[in-house]
């Protein structure tokens, strides 16, 4: 939005106020300057639903990190358009929801996915190699609540085969980007990024 200032602050309350107390104390400033605000407790685990298709490396990494307590989240379900990882997910005691997605039933499939999200009380959806482009309607309904991990240093090399694109362009760095999902493919606000350097060593396209 134009003519808006956005700010995110992390702080610790030495007096131990509750979130409700902080909201009440902050409200006069909100009214005075016509601000929009939200308070979140960093210690509270976010309820998350993962979405995956047929590549399991992201899913397995998230499940492992969640299992050892390395992620401050509560995985309340996994949604997939395939059955490949049902046993893996249910072995962790997590509900697995198989919803087949085709061009013909995409609207109905997304409506079913949204019902699962609402019923589970999930605050976030994480796309762990979910190989379907979400509709504009779903992106709008879940604005700011869907996270994608794209395997390039955005805004470079959007879309499919980003490593191949990077290799053909001859770049010396490749990266990964976590971003919020919007209706524009790989264009959402960036959350975090990381990079690694690459060499001139021969690389097989099968690994890109």
Language-model-detected regions and their locations in the chain:
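Histidine-anchored nucleotide/phosphate-binding helix
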Residues: 59-67
């Amino acid at each position: 939005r134009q003519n808006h200032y956005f700010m995110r602050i992390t702080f610790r309350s030495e007096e131990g106020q509750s979130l409700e107390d902080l909201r009440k104390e902050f409200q006069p400033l909100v009214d005075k300057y016509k601000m929009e605000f939200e308070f979140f407790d960093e210690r509270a685990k976010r309820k998350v639903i993962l979405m995956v298709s047929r590549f399991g490396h992201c899913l397995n990494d998230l499940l492992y990190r969640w299992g050892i307590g390395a992620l401050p989240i509560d995985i309340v379900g996994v949604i997939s358009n395939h059955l490949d990882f049902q046993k893996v997910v249910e072995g962790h005691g997590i509900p697995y929801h198989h919803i087949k997605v085709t061009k013909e039933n995409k609207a109905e499939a997304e409506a079913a996915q949204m019902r699962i999200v609402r019923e589970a009380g999930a605050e976030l959806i994480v796309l762990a190699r979910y190989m379907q482009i979400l509709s504009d309607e779903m992106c709008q309904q879940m604005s700011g609540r869907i996270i994608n991990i794209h395997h390039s240093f955005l805004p470079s090399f959007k879309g499919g085969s980003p490593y191949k694109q990077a290799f053909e362009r001859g770049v010396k760095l490749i990266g990964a980007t976590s971003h919020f999902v919007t209706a524009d493919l790989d264009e959402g606000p960036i959350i975090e990024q990381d990079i690694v350097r690459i060499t001139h060593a021969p690389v097989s396209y099968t690994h890109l």
